[in-house]
Amino acid sequence: MVIIVHGGVSKDEIPHASDCLVRACLAGWKALKEKEAVDGVEEAVKVLEDDPRLNAGTGAFPNLLGEVEMSASIMKDDFSCGGVAGIKNIKNPISVARAVMERTRHVLLVGEGANLFARLLGFEPYNPVGELTVRTLQKSVEKARKEKDSIYHYYLERAREKLKRMHLGTVGAVVLDGKGHLAAGTSTGGVEMQLPGRVGDSPIVGCGTFAWEWGAVSMTGEGEGIIKLGLARKIGEWMEHCSAQEAVERGMELARRFGVLCGAIAVRRDGGIGFGESEGTMICAYFKEDMMEPLAPKRRPNEDRQSR
C-alpha cells in the first residue's frame, strides 16, 4: 500500500502545513487498511479540505464577489470518475465528487446543479469562509482599491502576475491499496479573486486528476495551463513505460516549456511514487508499507531530485 498527498505549489510563500499532510496520510492509510483505494483518497482529501491553511474546503479562496466556489474530482483505475465544479456551501467537495461517480451516470456536475445534488443526498450546508479566508479577501480588495481602475479591471490586468507569485493551494491524494488498485482525487477553492464561474483543472478528469491501470496522478498549480496541456493524463500514461518519478519529471519539463507553474504527485502500480514541480515548491507527504511514519520532504526549489 502507498499514499501520497499534496497541499499545493507556490513560487513564493508556502503554508506551514506539514502536520496536516501527515494527518491526511494517516487518515488515508487507516481507510486503506479497512477498505479500498477510493476510500483512502476520500479520507485523506477530507483532512486537507478541513484545514483552513490550505486552499480547499474550509480554507478555499473567495472569488471576485467574495463567494467561495469549490471544485473537486476523484477517479479509480477502472476509469470510474466523478467531479463537481463551482459548488458552494459544502464542507467536503471530494465527497460530493465521489457521489457523482457512484450514484449517477455523469462525470461532472457544476454550479447550482452540483449544489442541488449535494442537498438531495443529505450533505449539510456549510460556510467554508473562515477568519483566514476573510483576511485574505480583505487584503486583496484593499490592494485593488488603491488602483486607479475598477476592481474588475484590476483583476483582468493583474491575474497572470498574481498567479505566478501566489500560493496555488489545491490539495490532492493518490493511493495504491493492498489489492493493487489505484485511485486519485483533487480538491480546490480555485484562484484568489477569480472571476465568478471560473473553473480550473481540478474537477476535470485527465487534467487535474487521472487514474488507470498503470498509475494515478493529482495535479496542482495554474489550472488554465494544466488544462491546455492535459498534464494528469499525460503523466499517467507515461507510467506504462517509465517510473512514476520519471513520468512526473517529464510532465514538469513540458510545463516549464510552456511557462506553466504546477506540481504533481503520482503512484505507479508497482508502488513507486513520484512528485515534483515545474518551479517553486510543492508541499507533500507520503507513506509506504516499509515506513514507520509518513514523511513530509523538506525539498527546496532546484535541489537534486533523484528517483524514488
Q: Where are the model-predicted features located?
A:
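Alpha/propeptide regions of enzymes that mature by internal proteolysis
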Residues: 1-308
